[in-house]
């Protein structure tokens, strides 16, 4: 799963803490947050100091202003308190994105990299698949490998350094792959994709073993050309000012 804030944002013109809390947004800029998702419910408000994720309990459009009401309901476990203060004119509102990437079969039976976008509607309790359908991203992707780069300090009681010294699988994260602390010390991701051609190749296939991020892959003898593509992704917010 990949969670991030949208590149598009709208100006926050007013903010009041409490339960409910209210956030006023510039109505002229609001459409940029609904262009990719007509009814977003999960947002992030951020300035140069901090960021807070929340679910909108209700969204009301007025004259020049969109007002978002936030209550301790739905997926919100706590209310906005006095520590969550954002000055008008300095904070921006972002749509919070949640994507899952996975390998599946498309309607033609071909292996494909899919992307599913999830949302929680304003005031709702359940996470739903946006549009009800997953999106085909790349056809021909047969395998996906992931490795995670962790900070040199994995003890949650100590401050992170921003220095990476370990590349691990999801099951091998320190101090515990099932805890939030281990994932919060991830500062980078390595991605490996095995992609195959649509047709059989005329050239003779190589005999050397195929590896993706160090994992040896067993390939079928179907005559198709295959190649592995690898990349490194740095999580800048974890590496700088964590």
Positions of PLM-derived features:
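Autoprocessing Asn-cyclization modules and mimics
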Residues: 1-78
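Short linear sequence signals and composition-biased patches located at protein termini or domain-edge surfaces
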Residues: 74-75, 86-114, 119-242
């Amino acid at each position: 799963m990949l969670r991030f804030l949208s590149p598009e944002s709208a100006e926050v013109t007013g903010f009041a803490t409490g339960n409910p809390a209210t956030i006023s947004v510039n109505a002229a800029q609001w459409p940029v947050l609904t262009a990719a998702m007509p009814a977003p419910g999960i947002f992030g408000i951020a300035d140069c100091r901090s960021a807070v994720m929340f679910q909108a309990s209700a969204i009301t459009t007025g004259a020049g202003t969109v007002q978002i009401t936030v209550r301790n309901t739905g997926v919100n476990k706590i209310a906005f308190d006095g520590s969550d203060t954002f000055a008008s004119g300095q904070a921006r509102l972002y749509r919070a994105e949640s994507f899952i990437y996975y390998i599946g079969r498309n309607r033609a039976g071909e292996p494909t990299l899919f992307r599913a976008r999830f949302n929680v509607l304003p005031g709702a309790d359940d996470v739903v698949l946006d549009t009800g359908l997953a999106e085909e991203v790349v056809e021909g992707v047969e395998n996906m490998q992931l490795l995670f780069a962790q900070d040199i300090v994995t003890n949650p009681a100590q401050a992170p350094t921003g220095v990476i010294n370990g590349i691990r699988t999801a099951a091998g994260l320190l101090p515990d792959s099932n805890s939030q602390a281990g994932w919060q010390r991830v500062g980078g991701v390595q991605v490996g994709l095995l992609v195959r051609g649509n047709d059989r190749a005329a050239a003779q296939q190589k005999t050397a073993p195929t590896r993706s991020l160090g994992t040896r892959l067993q390939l079928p003898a179907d005559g198709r050309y295959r190649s592995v593509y690898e990349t490194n992704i740095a999580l800048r917010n974890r590496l700088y000012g964590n």
